[in-house]
Amino acid sequence: MIFSSEKELISYYSKFRNSNLNTLKNFTQSNFPEIKLKTNKGIVGQVLESLIGNAPNNDPNPDVLNLGIELKVMPLRKSSNSLVPKERSKIKKINYNSILDESWDTSFLKKKISKILFFLYEQPIGKTYRDWEEFTFLGTLLFDLQVDSYHIIKNDWLEIQKKVKSHLAHELSEGDSKVLGACTSGTGKIEKYDGLYEAKERSYSLKHNYLKLFYLEKYKK
C-alpha cells in the first residue's frame, strides 16, 4: 500500500485499535493472502506491518519507503496500574567498519531513525511472544528525530563513533550515553574492524528509560 502522508498512515492504523493480534492476522490472510508470517520473536511486528501489505524482509531501508518511516513495535506492560514501555528499542547492528568513515548527516543510523512509527501493544506479565494472538494493538506513536531529542542523539552517536575510531569499541557500554545506547546484541559474537581490532557485537537502541519518558510525554498527554 502507498500512503501520501504520515497522517494518512496513522489514520489507517487507527482503524485497528483495540483489536487482538489474531483478528489482525485474519485481516491479513483475507486481504494479503500471499504474505506468509513466521511465528518467531518478531511475529507481532510482522502482523502489524502486514496490515499495509509488507511481507517479512531484511530490507535495510525504511519500511514505508516513500515517507521515510521505520515501523517498530513498542510492547507495553503494567507497572503500578499504568502501562509503560517494557524494554529498550533496538534499531540496527553497529557496523564498526562503516562508522569509521561516516559523518552524522550522512550516517545510515540517522536515516534509519529519522521517523519511527511505533506500534503500541500490551504484553501482560508472564506472557511471551508465543502468546501473541492474545495481545491487543493499542495504537501508534510517532517519533520524529528532528523534534525528539535530536542533539542528544547526535552527540550520543558521535561518542560511539569516537570510541570506535579510537579502537575502543570493546569498551562501549549502554551506560555511556543518554538516549542512543550501544546495547549488547545477539550472542556476543566477536566482530573485527579496521583490520586488527575486535569487539563484541552491539546494536544501536533507544534506551528504556528514554522510551518510558517519551511514551508518557507523547502518548499520555
Where are these regions (language model features)?
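Nucleic-acid endonuclease domains
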Residues: 1-65, 70-221
